[in-house]
Amino acid sequence: GFGFVTNSMEYFSAYSQYVIATFLILFGVNFSLYYLILIGKCKEAFKSEELRTYLMIIVISVFIICFNVISNQIDNLQSLGVMDLEEIFRHSYFQVASIITTTGYSTTNYEYWPELSKCIILILMLLGAMAGSTGGGIKISRLVISFKGIFTRIRKLINPRYVSKTKFEGKILEETTTNDVFAFITLYFFLTFIIILILSCTLH
């Protein structure tokens, strides 16, 4: 998130912002997938369940924020420096790319965005990028495994005879693996809560 200008990426042209945002997303991809592409296994790389989820989250987040800003902030667009649909899309695209990869750059002050948009940004901060990337956060792989693990446990509760099998990237995961993921996410949110509590006590 470091830069040499005070207004971050807002200082640069629209073209530069698109290029930077795109490369932020690319660096949020698991580097092992790039290796598969380099050795000619492109189909195997693009079959990645985590990659599809990662890109889907980005696309959905961008369009929800775009629609939310347009529908709820029409009267405030000029004060935000957003004059047309292209700018709204660009700012949404860049902020989502920057937040989900835990980069820290920004092209606009999203403090003035609607509550839904800010909520999405907060969720993206916690999620982070793919495992094996430069991004931080919980990681998309853990998110997918946790949801599948929850679904498997629900089916087990409904039908005790059901043989629980949690699959990820075409492989059956051991129960200890899903338990480790649940433990990590629980610890992550617990520490986040503790840090927020400490900060709220120290702020005046």
Predicted feature residues:
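Membrane-proximal intracellular helices of multi-pass ion channels
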Residues: F2-H204
